[in-house]
């Protein structure tokens, strides 16, 4: 029993060390969800910022679609994308269509990378995304689409893509690509995906469940927990 108890203690400690970044992120999310539940004004501000980010993104993508300017915009959700943001330049600015068009202007320094949206703000630009490893993707998809799909495979982010070749607007979610979107369809999709519909209590309960699964899962299940 003495040996078994020590083995279990060491195993629990190893899990905590192994999943330390994920645990810290989940605890931060739990704290912020409690803060919003006690501060309705903060939640209202966040929703307003996200709605502005969506409307400005749709406006910018509509114009850049006409000029066939390549676009890659990542909307962060529950999973923090700090590692991805660090591959680019931290901006942390209010979202506007003009700012987005300046970033993706073909001669701009950050135009080849992705923009990261966080809590309704333009958090980073010029970021590098992981390419999809799906061998069944259509051959007509370029690097920008493969990067967008790859980002959605590796996180819960919503990724907006504008093709440089055709001007087509697409959205990648969960490894799936929705193509040929009209501006009004894009706006409706982003609102549905990014504006929380469930009460904060339900969101907090989901985070508790994720934290419990994270602490009790084995190392081999790490991909499913993220």
Predicted regions located by residue number:
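Membrane-water interface of transmembrane alpha-helices in multipass transporters/channels
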Residues: 1-10
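Divalent-cation
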Residues: 14, 19-22, 26-226
